[in-house]
Amino acid sequence: EQIASRPPQLSEAIPVTLDEKQQVHIPIEQVKDGKLHRFVWIADDGKAVRFFVINRQPDKLSLAAVFDACLLCGDQGYVMEGNQVVCVGCGVHMFIPSIGKPGGCNPVPIEDWQQTETEILINRASLEEGLNLFSTIVEIDVKDPISGTQMKNTKTEHKYNYEGKTYFFESEKNLDLFRDNPEKYLGKGE
């Protein structure tokens, strides 16, 4: 009886990375079976953005790519129970063909993803739209662009956002040097 009262556990999220064109590639063969396929992209500040792909129709290909979060319940995510997709936050059962449409407890849609003959392509800008939906920060190795010092993103409070990328610094002095003249240091410490 204790098992039934525990909240459903999310299936493991498969890590994805961006290619040189700033896109994630997901093979259709991997996600067309009607089950929920969860992925995670780690932004350069360590924020984990979860999303899933599901085929909405049993007899034909009708894929949806959505963030693993909703506007009502936040980033608790969704689970597959039998052939139902359920919001972990409130327990509502999704009408699977409606996944990909905005509103209610539906997962937040990912904008501007593309489908080719063989794969799904999601660009960085589309994934970044989901940054504010999630709160999990993953510890990653970062490098101070001034000194070249390696550190963990979670172990320094000195960070600065420049042209959509987060940079980390071992000291306030280094942050100030960078902020005053970022072009001088970019390309050197990356």
Annotate each language-model stretch with its function:
Residues 91-97, 113-114, 171:
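Short amphipathic alpha-helical patches
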Residues 77-82, 92-100:
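Iron-sulfur (Fe-S) cluster-binding segments and ferredoxin-like electron-carrier domains
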Residues 68, 85-88, 103:
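Extracellular secreted precursors and ectodomains with disulfide-bonded cysteine-rich loops/domains
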Residues 2-78, 100, 109-167, 177-190:
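N-terminal pre-ligand scaffold of iron-sulfur
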Residues 84-91, 165-174:
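Cysteine-rich micro-motifs
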